[in-house]
Amino acid sequence: MSAAFQPSLMMMQRPLGSSTAFSIDSLIGSPPPPAPGHFVYTGYPMFMPYRPVVLPPPPPALPQAALQPPLPPAPPPPLPALPGAFCPGLAQGMALTSTLMAALPGSFPASPPRPEAARKFAPPGNFDKADGLPPPDGGGGGGDDGKTGGGLLPFPAADAVHASLAGALRGGPKDDPKAEEEAKGREENFSMDSDLDYSSDENGPAPAAPREEDCGTALEENPPSAANAAANAAATGKNRRRRTAFTSEQLLELEKEFHCKKYLSLTERSQIAHALKLSEVQVKIWFQNRRAKWKRVKAGNASSKAGEPSRNPKIVVPIPVHVSRFAIRSQHQQLEQARP
C-alpha cells in the first residue's frame, strides 16, 4: 500500500530548489473560486426600490467555501462566474443581488437587518407584498420606530388633514349666499328708509321689492300681465318676488295715509293692513317705495332751473298698452283745462 500512495505523496512534497516558484503566499493567499450561489457583487448599493427577479434556489455550496470564514470585502472581481444571469443593465444587476442576499440569510451575519433597510428605501406597502418577506421582529425597536415615525405615520395624518380641509371648503360656500342676502336686505332697507324711520326696521330685513305704486294702476287694469310675469319667472327658474296687485280702493287709502304721515309705527301699520286686508310686509314695502318716489320728486324740484319747487309737481304714471291714444289725448286736455 505504501508503494501505491508513493507517487501522490511525492507530488504533495515541495521541491527544495524551487522556493521562488512555489511559496506559501501563492498557495494560501489566492482567493477561492467564487461559487455561483454565494457570489455577491458589492460595487453598487445592495437594496434599491426595484422589484427583484425571482431566481431558482442556488446549488449547494462547496465544502471548502462553507468551512472557510467569510472574507473581508475586496474590490469587485469580473463577472465570469455568473453565466447569463446578469444583464449589462444596472437595475437588473442590483435587483438580482438583493434577491441573492435575501435568499441566503444563514451564511452572512449582516443579512437580517437588510430587509428593514430595503423597506426604508422602497415605497411603503409594496416591498412586503411583492417579495413575501416576514415583518420585522419586535426586537429591532429603534429601526421600527424610525421607520414608522418617518415613513408610514404621516400618510394617514395627511389624509385626515386633507379631508378636514375639503369638508371646510365644501361647507363654507353654503352659508355665504344667506349672509350676503341678509346684508343686501339691510342695506336696501337702510337706503329706502331714512334715519328717521325707526319703526319700519323693527321687523327685520325685508327683500328688495319692486315698486308697486309705479305700476299699481297697470296691474289693477291688466291682471293677466302679473300671471304672465309669474309664469315667466317660473319658466326661467329664478325665484322672484311676485308683484302685489293693489286695488283702487287700497291705493286710495294708502295714498291718504301717506299724505297724512310719511312714516308709520308698528301699531299703525298693523291697523292699516287689517283694514285693507293686506299683510304688514306689503304695507311696509309700499310705504318704502312711496317714500323713495317722494324723495326723488323733491330732489328733482330742488335741482330745477327755476330754483324753487313748483306747486304742482308732475308724477309720471305708467299707462297700460291697451289704452287708446284718444283717451290719452282727452286726459291731457282735461289736465290742461284744470290748470288756472
From Swiss-Prot:
Record localization: Nucleus
Listed GO CC annotations: nucleoplasm; nucleus
CDD domains hit by this protein: homeodomain
Keyword Electron transport: no
InterPro entries: GBX-1/2 (IPR042982), HD (IPR001356), HD_metazoa (IPR020479), Homeobox_CS (IPR017970), Homeodomain-like_sf (IPR009057)
Disulfides per UniProt: none
Biased composition (Low complexity): 226-235
Keywords on record: DNA-binding, Homeobox, Nucleus, Transcription, Transcription regulation
Keyword DNA-binding included in the entry's annotation: yes
Biased composition regions of type Gly residues, renumbered to the chain: 138-152
BP GO annotations: autonomic nervous system development; axon guidance; branching involved in blood vessel morphogenesis; cerebellar granule cell precursor proliferation; cerebellum development; forebrain neuron development; inner ear morphogenesis; midbrain-hindbrain boundary morphogenesis
Annotated segments matching region Disordered: 106-155, 167-242
Gene3D superfamilies on file: Homeodomain-like (1.10.10.60)
Residue ranges of DNA binding: 239-298
Molecular function GO terms recorded: DNA-binding transcription activator activity, RNA polymerase II-specific; DNA-binding transcription factor activity, RNA polymerase II-specific; RNA polymerase II core promoter sequence-specific DNA binding; RNA polymerase II transcription regulatory region sequence-specific DNA binding; RNA polymerase II-specific DNA-binding transcription factor binding
Compositional bias annotation for Basic and acidic residues: 172-189
Entry function: May act as a transcription factor for cell pluripotency and differentiation in the embryo.
Name this polypeptide is given: Homeobox protein GBX-2
Taxonomic source organism: Gallus gallus (Chicken)
Gene encoding the protein: GBX2
